[in-house]
């Protein structure tokens, strides 16, 4: 069985590395992006099952990247989990996201949220 692909879009290397390690340990295949531009490119090319999207990133922030995902017919159904230290950032655009996680987030909550949005 092929592992479920999770795209992690996070500009801080250490945070991205920790999430990747946690998710790989839980049996997920992790695709990494350091900004919204890379996240869109990876989503188009690799079609992840779910995206964990930081809201504050260089080049293209997570909110803009998620709006772009929702505008593309082949990508709009991919669940997106917003991750931010400032949840008020997504309050006006909550409908774009399948879940919102406050940073920092425990590994258990991250995995549980991914499983919830995937219907597991």
Regions found by a protein language model. Give the residues of each.
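Conserved acidic carboxylate
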Residues: 10
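Charged docking surfaces used in two-component/phosphorelay signaling
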Residues: 17-25
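Short hydrophobic/Thr-rich beta-strand motif most characteristic of the beta2 strand and flanking loop
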Residues: 27-34, 42
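Acidic catalytic/metal-coordinating carboxylates
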Residues: 35-38, 61-67
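Active-site beta3 strand of CheY-like receiver
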Residues: 46-52
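Receiver (REC) domain active-site loop signature in two-component systems and cognate sites
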Residues: 57
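Hydrophobic/aromatic residues positioned on beta-strands within the core alpha/beta folds
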Residues: 81-84
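C-terminal output helix
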Residues: 105-118
